[in-house]
Curated annotation (Swiss-Prot):
It is found in: Cytoplasm, Cytosol; Cytoplasm, Cytoskeleton, Microtubule organizing center, Centrosome. InterPro entries: Chap_CCT_alpha (IPR012715), Chaperone_TCP-1 (IPR017998), Chaperonin_TCP-1_CS (IPR002194), Cpn60/GroEL/TCP-1 (IPR002423), GroEL-like_apical_dom_sf (IPR027409), GROEL-like_equatorial_sf (IPR027413), TCP-1-like_intermed_sf (IPR027410), TCP-1_chaperonin (IPR053374). This is T-complex protein 1 subunit alpha. The keyword Iron-sulfur does not apply.
């Protein structure tokens, strides 16, 4: 744009940029829209090197897309945030945000200032969260374990493992309850990362299993080592136990050929001393991220200890946390002397190498500091196993959230329909400009039941109208307030009581997705100017060789 102030780039302002942003958001939402709900479809994504991913998870789909538009990137980050914070509801949060933007754009085109729309949206979001917490939550104490299983099944219903929902829901609930520990404040905590998920392709989904203890996809370093150790003392090392070699560039001038042997002997003695220091503390299970050469293995075999090499760093960290061990990247202390103390060892009741499914695994059972659990997944191929892992991660997060927040809300579009009716009535009580924005917010929420119905090949107009009628009755007539649990039954194509049907989602999933979607919509709505700078041109007068040829500079 030329003018009094020259900007070396493209500048678009006002109406143009807002419409562009809304279109970008809508196109991102359209990608994930068809994967929402229990009958949502999967996406196949192929990256630039030909790796194939088949998934139904909104966050994974958007993470693998290479998005150019800055406003669309906001929505991709939004799905990622929802995945990290809550673990589920990633698709719906993007769809709601895009719908909020679309409706806000309509209002701005009718000459309503974006600031009024933004304040209306903020107010609507606040009211919606308050209404959920006061009227729509079901306390988990009155439902017990069934509630956890139902919440896990609801999360899995749209995924590849939805067919065997009962089997996997029980497995997930058992896994989360197995890793429970109490923090300093006396609050129960469920670190989902303590559940190690291993994948082995072959057999059917139903042959997946839950194992008590941490399963390591490794075997002992030598066949001469014991395969089972009771009262294990575990050393976690982040370095290799190999014959020490002199650093490159170190030169030793020798006057006597016999001294060569002494140097070689010293090289092997350094490692031997290290191993003896470790074994002297009573360590009988040694896990290392590096390699262990044959010479070092000999010492462990003689001592009757179990040594495991090439353990993944991620696994080592989790085992150290569970057993109370300290991960050491060197034995040297601040003075430069090599020491190893018994306090650095972790403890477990038993470490055993077992053949599970078709693989040899090392199981670390009953660790001292925290308990851990492992799930071994079976599936037809790698794509299936990867998708099963993502589905289980979502379900684990959902069960964790239900246990921590102790409340759930009905699924199947029930919350969105109830909020839509409530906010429409609330909007009419407002005398200010925010009234229109709140009404649009209410209309935007209906995109979830609408999309659910469309994906299930049902008549969305008819179904959503019936659903709204039930919720209106529930809010107007106090005697029929039980109708507020009505959501969609997508397999039969009619509304039903989702509290009785056991379709539940954690309250925090709904609350966070509303808050995040509103914030993302507001962030994009506030933008009224986009300046995209041109890439910096090189200082070189002629640029590249081709430019020089074209310009005739080489003809001089």
């Amino acid at each position: 744009m030329e003018g009094p102030l020259s900007v070396f780039g493209d500048r678009s302002t006002g109406e143009t940029i807002r419409s562009q942003n809304v279109m970008a958001a809508a196109s991102i939402a359209n990608i994930v829209k068809s994967s929402l709900g229990p009958v949502g479809l999967d996406k196949m994504l192929v990256d630039d090197i030909g790796d194939v991913t088949i998934t139904n998870d909104g966050a994974t789909i958007l993470k693998l897309l290479e998005v150019e538009h800055p406003a669309a990137k906001v929505l991709c980050e939004l799905a990622d945030l929802q995945d990290k914070e809550v673990g589920d509801g990633t698709t719906s949060v993007v769809i709601i945000a895009a719908e909020l933007l679309k409706n806000a754009d309509e209002l701005v085109k009718q000459k309503i200032h974006p600031t009024s729309v933004i304040s209306g949206y903020r107010l609507a979001c606040k009211e919606a969260v308050r209404y959920i917490n006061e009227n729509l939550i079901v306390n988990t104490d009155e439902l017990g374990r069934d509630c956890l299983i139902n919440a896990a099944k609801t999360s899995m219903s749209s995924k590849i493992i939805g067919i065997n929902g009962d089997f996997f829901a029980n497995m997930v609930v058992d896994a989360v309850l197995a890793i429970k520990y109490t923090d300093i404040r006396g609050q129960p905590r469920y670190p989902v990362n303590s559940v190690n998920i291993l994948k082995a392709h072959g057999r059917s989904q139903m042959e997946s299993m839950l194992i008590s203890g941490y399963a390591l996809n490794c075997v002992v370093g030598s066949q001469g080592m014991p395969k089972r150790i009771v009262n294990a003392k575990i050393a976690c090392l982040d370095f290799s136990l190999q014959k020490t070699k002199m650093k490159l560039g170190v030169q030793v001038v020798i006057t006597d050929p016999e001294k060569l042997d002494q140097i070689r002997q010293r090289e092997s003695d350094i490692t031997k001393e290290r191993i003896q220091k470790i074994l002297a503390t009573g360590a009988n299970v040694i896990l290392t991220t590096g390699g262990i050469d044959d010479m070092c293995l000999k010492y462990f075999v003689e001592a009757g200890a179990m040594a495991v090499r090439r353990v993944l760093k991620r696994d080592l960290k989790r085992i150290a946390k569970a057993s109370g061990a300290t991960i050491l990247s060197t034995l040297a202390n601040l003075e430069g002397e090599e020491t190893f103390e018994a306090a650095m060892l972790g403890q477990a009741e038993e470490v055993v190498q077992e053949r599970i499914c078709d693989d040899e695994l090392i199981l670390i059972k009953n660790t001292k500091a925290r308990t851990s659990a492992s799930i071994i997944l079976r599936g037809a191929n790698d794509f299936m196993c990867d998708e099963m892992e993502r589905s289980l991660h979502d379900a684990l997060c959902v069960v964790k959230r239900v246990l921590e927040s102790k409340s759930v809300v009905p699924g199947g579009g029930a919350v969105e329909a109830a909020l839509s009716i409530y906010l429409e009535n609330y909007a009419t009580s407002m005398g200010s400009r925010e009234q229109l924005a709140i009404a649009e917010f209410a209309r935007s929420l209906l995109v979830i039941p609408n999309t659910l119905a469309v994906n299930a090949a049902q008549d969305s107009t008819d179904l959503v109208a019936k659903l709204r009628a039930f919720h209106n009755e529930a809010q107007v007539n106090p005697e029929r307030k039980n109708l507020k649990w009505i959501g969609l039954d997508l397999s039969n194509g009619k509304p039903r009581d989702n509290k009785q049907a056991g379709v539940f989602e954690p309250t925090i999933v709904k609350v966070k997705s509303l808050k995040f979607a509103t914030e993302a919509a507001i962030t994009i709505l506030r933008i009224d100017d986009l300046i995209k700078l041109h890439p910096e041109s090189k200082d070189d007068k002629h640029g590249s060789y081709e430019d020089a040829v074209h310009s005739g500079a080489l003809n001089d």
